[in-house]
Amino acid sequence: MTEQVRIEPVIDYLTGLQDRICQGIAGADGSGEFKEDSWTREEGGGGRSRVLTEGAVFEQAGINFSHVTGASLPPSATAHRPELAGRRFQATGVSLVIHPRNPYVPTSHANVRFFIAEKEGAEPIWWFGGGFDLTPYYGEDEDCVHWHRVAKAACEPFGPEVYPRYKQWCDEYFFLRHRNEPRGVGGLFFDDLNEWGFEKSFAFMRSVGDHYLDAYLPIVARRKDTPYGERERDFQLYRRGRYVEFNLVYDRGTLFGLQSGGRTESILMSLPPLVRWRYNWQPEPGTPEARLYEHFLKPREWVE
């Protein structure tokens, strides 16, 4: 018997997830509030973007839900999958990036998504994707271990091989080839997930989405009151430049969104509000800034 593939329960889950994460982030901030911007897309679908700016803890937090439909796919989607050409599609997901004010609090990103392409007389082509990853400026081993423990816990019900596979994929995906360095300390990344069938794949996507706040909020609570000065802030803004470079050059979601006529404001919501580039800057040996490169920006096993 063929398993039924339905987008409606996925949309229900994702809108609820956006609500829960907004509540968790606003609660951790203590003073900031999310402003909602609902939008529709001429070709079909729409979404709701929620942004918290100038909070006590978070300089900017963007949490976006979208459900877009179209009669055909953009080149970024069909280049490696010619079987998708000529199919109508639906894509839905929640994507978020949290940029904290304090340089001792890492930036975090999470995304869970579902894609389906259909045409008359043919089986639908569908998959799930997503993950979450952490980008510290002044890293702490304790935080990285906690982040990866929660990532592993999200995967464990689905088999012992799942966390190592998606942890490695995350390390490989969030890598700036032109800098030859990782974006951060990783986490989970998965895409094109359909081999488990619809229900199990959907359950895994939910597990990843449901574990994000457990992974991030304890780190925020530990670091948000750490004293810092101009030097730390300057380094944070410099390292944010790497975030911008990755999102505009490599990120699949950004490229897909821009090529498919997505909503530019929502797609670029992931970019930090302030950022700084410096020509050929290098950290002084033996400094906390150098330790980020030497100790944290090297893929490693954080949990057994």
Swiss-Prot record:
Pathway: Porphyrin-containing compound metabolism; protoporphyrin-IX biosynthesis; protoporphyrinogen-IX from coproporphyrinogen-III (O2 route): step 1/1. Homodimer. It comes from Thioalkalivibrio sulfidiphilus (strain HL-EbGR7). One of its GO terms (molecular function) is protein homodimerization activity. Substrate binds at S95, N111, V112, R113, G261, G262, R263. InterPro entries: Coprogen_oxidase_aer, Coprogen_oxidase_aer_sf, Coprogen_oxidase_CS. This is Oxygen-dependent coproporphyrinogen-III oxidase. Its EC number is 1.3.3.3. GO terms for biological process: protoporphyrinogen IX biosynthetic process. SUPFAM superfamilies: Coproporphyrinogen III oxidase. Gene3D superfamilies: Coproporphyrinogen III oxidase, aerobic (3.40.1500.10). It catalyses: coproporphyrinogen III + O2 + 2 H(+) = protoporphyrinogen IX + 2 CO2 + 2 H2O.
